[in-house]
Amino acid sequence: MLKRFTRYVTQSVAGMIGISVYVLADTFFISVYSGADGLAVLNLILPVYGLIYAIGAMIGIGSATRYAISRAKGKNTEHYFVQSVTWSILAAVPFMLIGIFIPDKALALLGADAGLIGLGRNYVRIILIATPFFMSNYTFTAFARNDGAPSIAMIGSISGSIFNIIFDYIFMFPVGLGFSGAGLATAICPIVTMSVCTIHYRSSRNHVGFHWKKPSFRHLISCCQLGVSAFVGELSSGVIAIVFNFLILGIAGNMGVAAYGVVANLSIVAFAIFNGLAQGAQPLISESYGKGQPTQVRKLLKWSLLVCLAVEALIQLIIWTSTDTLISIFNSENNVQLLNYAHTGLRLYFLGFIVAGINIVLVAYFSAVDELKIAIVGSFLRGIVAIVICAVILAKLFGLDGIWISLLTAETVTFLTILFLAYKDRNRIE
């Protein structure tokens, strides 16, 4: 089982890092193309990515988790995949309409001024129109992973990311599409990933059914309950971005937002690692839980937490020894003010990952074993409630430094709450 755990987690983490490169590649090339203004625009758009990914993850990962549990119990799962794709497409329609008709208003709502709206209009239009691909991508990768093909899911994600990196450059510079080129490359990315995942679905090893069944709202709710932790895990970056953007705009203006763009984009990689760890362990935990193997379930949780602690230590080492080097990747203009803001921000903000990784693993664990109350409370607390309250209060008390340290404060509150709920319900959980 340890060998299988290692394979699932390693490949899931690699795949999630691949997905995070969607945004990182855009950030790098856009910083080269338009400097601090480009970083500010992209950071204002991050909440849009967060919401799209969150809904896609809730439907796709929730459905795949329900598929794993139901299949382990011998239930009929022939329609789960098609239902998941159908609901993903339906959920994408409002985003597409906004992208087609009112992208300017969407950017203004996120805090962009007239100059930033002009710069980012076509980019956000392309991203919103491509929402069905972003959302369905989670279904394709999660079902492949939960159907015993984590390597295919990983290869698919990495293939999409490589495409994104190469064509970001080609579309933006040689072709001359600029900001729009970055959006186009990112929009095609999930199509590449899904195409690779189709290799598994067409193979003899596939157990996923493709039977059509009228979309069931009851089935959707059943699956989404198991996908809430994934939803909040993806949404949290968007919520944090919205709150931080407005708070930082009032304290440090556009340059402060650009600095947060550097911090936020690097944090995407850290979140991807921990989400990959949680999603890699989840199908094994769900399978063991469905088969009634509590000893195996506890062993998988222990391994997940040990890996989490090791990764947290490595992340802190990298951040504290390579702060300015990491910032320089996105600071093509060598802006001193941007460097100063981001230097402090990166070190203080990333202290939050000492606890965040553990919370992500615990929330995914409780979701995998159908302990929805703890999973939902933990998810919403760390992703929305605690971080918003802490950011607002600490910003008033300590200014910009208070905003940076709010992640650590919120994650600590969440961790203590999860421990309390788990202890309170320990007899039923065991």
Question: Would you name each region that the model predicts?
Answer:
Residues 24, 33-36, 70, 146-147, ...:
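Helix-loop interface residues and adjacent transmembrane-helix termini in multi-pass membrane transporters
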Residues 39-97, 134-146, 150-152, 259-317, ...:
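Small-residue-rich hydrophobic transmembrane alpha-helices
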Residues 1-13, 67-130, 177-228, 285-352, ...:
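Short alpha-helical transmembrane segments in multi-pass integral membrane proteins
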Residues 12-61, 65, 130-134, 221-287, ...:
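Transmembrane helix-bundle signature of multi-pass secondary active exporters and lipid flippases
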Residues 60, 126-145, 153-164, 182-197, ...:
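Short runs within selected transmembrane alpha-helices of multi-pass transporters and secretion channels
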Residues 27, 36-39, 150, 179, ...:
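Membrane-helix interface/capping residues of multi-pass secondary transporters
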Residues 23, 27, 31, 99, ...:
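Juxtamembrane/transmembrane-helix interface segments of polytopic membrane transporters
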Residues 99, 142, 168, 172, ...:
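Structural signal for membrane-spanning alpha-helices in multi-pass inner-membrane proteins
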